[in-house]
């Protein structure tokens, strides 16, 4: 008994947090950087951005269905026949959507059908519970520096990503540049897994495993434990990048100028001795749609600066696709006097603020797009922005809509639910007025059937 206890305690002591590699200086031309990826892409003068919301496997399945549906609607971008799935430059993923986003970045168009086989058809949730209840994992879970969030990372490694780091992803990705987001539970701030963001922590993102970022983004509080990230701020000479300095010169009193200062001169993480660690949880708590990443950039830069940046990269069209897997918040508690259950209270505590914040982000983004396009009428080189919003709530009234909106947030869905979400994605893409308008403006390639009919007509 004493020997067994000694082995147990020894195992616990061996499980310690492994810090991410630090940097001694910022290297702006190296690493997994968003701006570098944009500079190296855009061969067709069109910037295509995908956004996959949170929502567990429901979100991953709906996003996968949208990518599959886009392949049925080819379009012309600068005379080149392509699809949005094949042409995506950036993908933002949050919580369940981050699983698909990271895999899409790694495999590109081959995400179809690989992701369905490797993830959607697997009972990922059962595998997780099996690991959590395994006797062999109990010593590790007894460690104060190892938790269920770390087990989630291991399961993502076993199922999808292996030991791939962001350095590997930077070298070998076949798809769009992925921005995975989590939430710092102490500050409530969004943490994007890009080297631009990790510069402030004086950390080398290339050393971090992709599965850890996805696990952090997916770590729903209470169900999973937070994932730890070390903070080395103040030890690499980091300053606000030169490209941002211009927007900080003004001391005006406008709300936008105050917001710029708040975003760019945030001192919260500057003292790594006071805050040596971050504890990361579900990215959906701060930005369940992924839209805030773009809204923050719009708040930092004046439209004239954004215009100049896009023109410098020869971009004349921006396409933003938002896939929103938000389900129906139960209203049954309003139909009876009985005190809601503990589960109902937990769900309301998490889901209601997320739903309200998502609606506000959606309204702000639509207003931003409208204002941008209105300003382009007088631009010397107009840059058209298309916003394709695809939400389960936009499905037409039908049994399918009812079923889709009542699919729970879990990491396993039965085959029927996966098929419902794929069918829902087809309908949303087909009925989207924004997507159909984009196809009209960009041009639709001739289908083989139409070409054959035209050839027959010419013969006669």
Question: What annotation goes with each model-predicted range?
Answer:
Residues 1-13:
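Sec-dependent bacterial lipoprotein signal peptides
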Residues 12-460:
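Catalytic domains of lipid- and phosphate-ester/thioester hydrolases
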